[in-house]
Design a protein with these regions (language model features):
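Non-transmembrane, aqueous-exposed alpha-helical and coiled segments at domain scale
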Residues: 1-170, 174-328
Length: 328
């Protein structure tokens, strides 16, 4: 996952204030809207390249190549900004990491209240993106224990804001990527970092959580486990997939949150920063303990996915394009 700058709309800005950074709530709403519009109409370069690889791979089945070519054709059409990549828009998720040196201005200069909280600002941006870009409203809300109805707004969004310890002076940068991502460029400056995930970050309904004993933690048992779970994914979630596996953790919640971030490439960025002497706040999901990336098992996951024969929907070897395996 690569970070890149995006610029807030004209007239909206974040500014240095004393020893910290003040961000107007309207900025949060504006680039949340920008992020979800972008996610609805454009693929990240990495994904496009993986589709090209499938289409050009001599080992690909005819069906694999057909799917890859059609997805690339759809990407060209969607990039024009009228027809989205997929009408199954799903849950909008926002993850944010807010340094102690950052405050949000939720009222206008005249005292008019824009938003009651950062969460409301993010939610407003999500709602506007789905309404103004003719995206499908696919969120159901309960009317009773057994009955539900469409919210007709694609809200509520899932918004998780984490408090982090960064402080200092300077300005933040905004960024966007596949799931759209943001960070300050200098670890000595306060920053407000964002991760936007459309469709629940992929297909959340394919998430599987298993409580097991240590008997699973040997190569033979673990491989049998993976073969069963990967085959059970099927093709309904529109492969080629990114398959992420996280083993261990202090709680189910920690495991699943680490898993979600693994699918977005968040931990890839963390690993890269660590290698070049940078810093990242691992405590936001891993309790101060770095997830151990297991690259050899990532290769095995891709092999197992290929061996299912499911392919990119209609038979072949390209069920998965990427894999991430972490141990907590």
């Amino acid at each position: 996952m690569e970070f890149e700058k995006i610029i807030p709309a004209s007239g909206l800005a974040a500014e240095q204030c004393g020893q910290g950074l003040t961000v107007d709530g309207s900025v949060l709403a504006a680039f949340t809207e920008q992020a979800f519009k972008r996610l609805s109409f454009t693929f990240p370069q990495e994904h496009l390249e993986s589709l090209v690889d499938v289409a050009c791979d001599p080992a690909s089945s005819e069906n694999d190549r057909l799917v890859a070519v059609k997805l690339l054709e759809n990407a060209v059409i969607a990039a024009k900004g009228t027809l989205p990549l997929c009408q199954d828009t799903g849950v909008a998720q926002v993850f944010a990491w807010k340094d102690a040196g950052v405050c949000t201005a939720l009222t206008a200069a005249g005292g008019t209240v824009h938003f009651g909280s950062d969460e409301e600002a993010f939610t407003a941006g999500v709602g506007k993106a789905y309404k103004e870009n003719n995206l499908r409203f696919s969120i159901n809300i309960p009317s009773s224990l057994f009955d539900e109805k469409n919210s007709a707004t694609n809200l509520p969004a899932q918004v998780d804001i984490f408090s982090t310890n960064g402080a200092g002076t300077g300005t933040a940068e905004y960024a966007g990527s596949s799931c759209s991502n943001g960070t300050g460029s200098d670890s000595t400056e306060p920053s407000y970092r964002f991760l936007f995930c459309a469709k629940g970050g992929g297909s959340s309904n394919k998430t599987d959580f298993t409580c097991a004993t240590k008997a699973l933690l040997n190569p033979q048992s673990f491989e049998r486990f993976l073969k069963t779970k990967i085959a059970a994914l099927g093709t309904a979630a529109c492969p080629p997939y990114t398959i992420a596996v996280v083993i261990g953790g202090l709680s189910p919640e920690q495991n699943l949150q680490t898993l979600k971030l693994a699918t977005t490439g968040y931990w890839d960025a963390a690993e890269a920063l660590n290698k070049i002497g940078g810093s990242i706040r691992w405590t936001d999901t891993a309790g101060g303990v770095r997830p151990l990336r297991c690259r050899d098992w990532e290769e095995r996951v891709l092999q197992i996915a290929a061996e299912t024969g499911l392919g990119a929907q209609f038979g072949g070897s390209h069920l998965a394009a990427h894999a991430r395996v972490f141990r907590l």
